Curated annotation (Swiss-Prot):
Spans through the membrane: none
GO molecular function, one term: tRNA binding
Family from the record: Belongs to the universal ribosomal protein uL5 family.
Protein name per its UniProtKB record: Large ribosomal subunit protein uL5
Assembly with partners or alone: Part of the 50S ribosomal subunit; part of the 5S rRNA/L5/L18/L25 subcomplex. Contacts the 5S rRNA and the P site tRNA. Forms a bridge to the 30S subunit in the 70S ribosome.
Naturally occurring in which organism (per UniProt): Prochlorococcus marinus (strain MIT 9211)
Gene3D superfamilies reported for this sequence: 3.30.1440.10
Protein task: This is one of the proteins that bind and probably mediate the attachment of the 5S RNA into the large ribosomal subunit, where it forms part of the central protuberance. In the 70S ribosome it contacts protein S13 of the 30S subunit (bridge B1b), connecting the 2 subunits; this bridge is implicated in subunit movement. Contacts the P site tRNA; the 5S rRNA and some of its associated proteins might help stabilize positioning of ribosome-bound tRNAs.
Keyword Lyase included in the entry's annotation: no
GO CC annotation, single: ribonucleoprotein complex
Keyword tRNA-binding: yes
Pfam families: Ribosomal_L5, Ribosomal_L5_C
Length: 179
């Protein structure tokens, strides 16, 4: 059973009852997943950016968008418009497929993994997770990468509070660390 189907059939009715909501449309849901990688060295080395774009496309199944510097910063040797990273916004079926792979395959492959931090909510029910290395995803082979780079994964939900967001992600299967 896919994650989307499981959400619709079992998780949503359970959350409706647990959160004490009156309407099925009030139940929090995952709106989008944003996968972001900042590459400061991409301004000097274009191969870094190309490798990162192909890795992100392999991991997410969607072409990555190049993020560019909004203004020049002399201390970082960056001019306006220089490429400084890449990002992918996932919605719909690809989003659920990515979340399923993240929860069931990627997170358990992290070294010394004891669960994700329950404190990374932003106050509005959205969750941000930092990944230190791209090797946790089974699509990336160790031989094909030049350097180990991390990425930020933001899960945007329709939840109105952190408690609702935490309840949603816990129901989806996120392994939160007990504090």
């Amino acid at each position: 059973m896919s994650l989307k189907h499981r959400y619709r059939e079992t998780i949503r009715p359970k959350l409706l009852k647990d959160l004490g909501l009156s309407n099925i449309h009030q139940v929090p849901k995952v709106v989008k997943v944003n996968v972001n990688r900042g590459l400061g060295e991409a301004a000097q080395n274009s191969k870094t950016l190309e490798a990162s774009l192909s890795e992100m496309a392999t991991i997410t199944g969607q072409k990555a968008l190049v993020t560019r510097a909004k203004k020049a910063i002399a201390g970082f040797k960056i001019r306006e418009g220089m490429p400084i990273g890449c990002t992918v916004t996932l919605r719909g079926e690809r989003m659920y497929a990515f979340l399923e792979r993240l929860i069931n395959l990627a997170l358990p492959r992290i070294r010394d993994f004891r669960g994700v931090s329950p404190k990374s909510f932003d106050g509005r029910g959205n969750y941000t997770l930092g990944v230190k290395e791209q090797l946790i995803f089974p699509e990336i082979s160790f031989d094909k990468i030049d350097t180990i780079r991390g990425m930020d994964i933001t899960i945007v939900t329709s939840a109105r509070s952190d408690e609702e967001g935490r309840a949603l992600l816990k129901a989806l299967g996120f392994p939160f660390r007990s504090t």
